Amino acid sequence: MRRAWILLTWVLVACVSAESRAELTSDKDMYLDNNSIEEASGVYPIDDDDYASASGSGAGEDGESPELTTSRPIPKIPFTSTAPRVETTTLSKIQDKIPAQTKSPEEIDKEKVHLPDSERKTDPAEEDTNVYTEKHSDNLFKRTEVLAAVIAGGVIGFLFAIFLILLLVYRMRKKDEGSYDLGERKPSSAAYQKAPTKEFYA
């Protein structure tokens, strides 16, 4: 039993360390992108013209445009609904959010030239179709998949606890019966001989 707990502890430590190692390696901020050195931190184009034309007094022209801020009135009654909202969007709106491709325009044109006319006309990306997206509530336990995972984890934990209790009771009973090997040697039958029960009086 002691070995099982030690083994379980080692497995748990290995899982936690693997999880933290995966988080560290997946972090995009650790490595610089070699393709975009100009966008990297601390690398700026050299422009000496701005330094020579400034007076240093701070009274120069203000080349910045004023920032515009917009505000919306906040509704007085907060919206509280437990039902998720359904928002309709079209594929063209979703495709506007897709990041730009890394192919050059010449490669894209070459691919379009090689496509037959029947495939070009029936491109599903160009058609507007309705897509329903469900907005999830802010509360974590109101989401069905999280609630199902918590319930399943609770049931498995409860069954595991019952299993451990039953195993403990079984071992205690077996130990009380005497058939449980405790590592002690039983004395041989020749070691203890029964004394004669007859008494002789002189």
From Swiss-Prot:
All ranges on the Cytoplasmic side of the membrane: 170-202
GO CC, any one term: membrane
Record flagged with keyword Membrane: yes
Sites carrying sugar chains: 41, 55, 57
Basic and acidic residues bias: start-end ranges: 104-124
Signal peptide range: 1-22
S-S bridge residues: none
Role according to the record: Cell surface proteoglycan which regulates dendritic arbor morphogenesis.
Name of the protein: Syndecan-2
Organism listed in the record: Bos taurus
